[in-house]
Amino acid sequence: MKGRKRTALVDVLGLVLKCHVGAANQADVKAAPWVVFAILESNERMSKVLADQGYQGDLEEDVEAVYEVIFEVVTHEGKEFSVQAKRWIVERTWAWLDNNRALTRDYERLPENHEGMVYAAMIRLMLRRLENNRRTWKKEKP
């Protein structure tokens, strides 16, 4: 495999719920079922999935019919740049993950190992955030 493409489903905080690593020449629509269906089968509380224009078509219809979840494809009008709603959350997650050296280079032979590295990087990031947000108690000086 010459290159890899990561497809991920994140929550509103930008935390990775499910990740799939496939060939770089694989279209987004082909990789999305690995991610979307796996999460929707295990998470009954999810009511809405936001996606960009690369996920239009049969996937949208299948998700809404089978799982009764709103699958909203965010589109932009015109040729000018415009900020897409909630798109920055996913891009921010990719930026967080790109800070990990193990993910910037392709060290693994198997895509499954790369997925594991994505999850490990996300766990490390979440633990670091929990540690930085803990309350520190000041000791009183005698």
Task: Locate predicted features.
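Polybasic low-complexity intrinsically disordered regions
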Residues: 1-70, 122, 136-142
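Basic, amphipathic alpha-helical segments enriched in Lys/Arg and hydrophobic/aromatic residues
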Residues: 57-61, 66, 80-142
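Short, acidic/turn-prone active-site loops that include or flank metal/cofactor-
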Residues: 23, 75-80
